[in-house]
């Protein structure tokens, strides 16, 4: 799949603010320091489309990005419609709030949990949640429960092992095998990635192209 352009659409702090674009959507979820921003920037060939916060875990919004919009195609936010038919390769990438790092107040944590649930249950065109995990870390029961939560909502989950350049090839293979056993996951749905080396990019984009 060729990426022509990518643009920020909107940041939402509650479900009422979620944009209705009408094209396939792919979300990214993981710990606050798992490298979501770097991965999305790598996928769309932009250095700073997704801002990396100076304090990991402080992003509390659901951020939406539109990919491959032709210059001739305009979106009217009032009517929530495009000026013409959307091309087949146009889609939305969604950056979901990270978890497990920032010290948020109990109320704010509950608000994010509620927003995540509302997102997952109100996006009929959501095709895949890419679940990011640092390849240097051991998987946790919390991550297993999170994947089970998404599966319980009939959402396809693909695990992306990030920061693969920080470990050797053998360790990458071992981690992938261990994760497949721990999560009872098909290895084809575990992608090894490195934003720094741009590895895994083609695998992720190929999967997106198949699901659009």
From Swiss-Prot:
Question: Which co-factor is required?
Answer: Mg(2+)
BP terms from Gene Ontology: division septum assembly
Q: Which UniProt keywords apply?
A: Cell cycle, Cell division, GTP-binding, Magnesium, Metal-binding, Nucleotide-binding, Septation
Binding of Mg(2+), residues: 37, 59
Q: GO molecular function, one example? A: GTP binding
Q: Does the keyword section mention GTP-binding?
A: yes
Pfam families named in the record:
MMR_HSR1
User: Which amino acids does the record list as binding GTP?
Assistant: 30-37, 57-61, 95-98, 162-165, 192-195
Q: Which residues form the EngB-type G domain?
A: 22-212
Q: Which family does it belong to?
A: Belongs to the TRAFAC class TrmE-Era-EngA-EngB-Septin-like GTPase superfamily. EngB GTPase family.
Role: Necessary for normal cell division and for the maintenance of normal septation.
Q: Which PANTHER family match?
A: ENGB-TYPE G DOMAIN-CONTAINING PROTEIN, MSS1/TRME-RELATED GTP-BINDING PROTEIN
Record-given protein name: Probable GTP-binding protein EngB
Q: Highest lineage ranks of the organism?
A: Bacteria, Pseudomonadati, Spirochaetota, Spirochaetia, Spirochaetales
């Amino acid at each position: 799949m060729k990426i022509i352009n990518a643009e920020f659409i909107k940041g939402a702090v509650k479900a009422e603010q979620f944009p209705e674009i009408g094209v396939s959507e792919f979300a990214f979820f993981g710990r606050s320091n798992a490298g979501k921003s770097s991965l999305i920037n790598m996928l769309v060939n932009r250095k700073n489309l997704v801002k990396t916060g100076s304090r990991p875990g402080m992003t509390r919004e659901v951020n939406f990005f539109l990919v491959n919009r032709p210059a001739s195609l305009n979106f009217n936010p009032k009517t929530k419609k495009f000026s013409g038919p959307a091309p087949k390769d146009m889609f939305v990438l969604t950056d979901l709030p990270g978890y497990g790092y920032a010290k948020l107040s109990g109320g704010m944590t509950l608000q994010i949990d509620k927003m995540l649930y509302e997102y997952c249950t109100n996006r009929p065109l959501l095709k895949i949640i890419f679940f990011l995990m640092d390849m240097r870390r051991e998987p946790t029961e919390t991550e297993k429960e999170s994947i089970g939560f998404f599966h319980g909502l009939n959402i396809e989950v693909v695990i992306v092992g990030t920061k693969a350049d920080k470990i050797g090839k053998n360790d990458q293979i071992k981690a992938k095998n261990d994760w497949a056993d721990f999560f009872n996951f098909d290895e084809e749905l575990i992608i090894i990635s490195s934003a720094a080396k741009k590895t895994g990019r083609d695998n992720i984009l190929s999967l997106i192209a198949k699901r659009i």
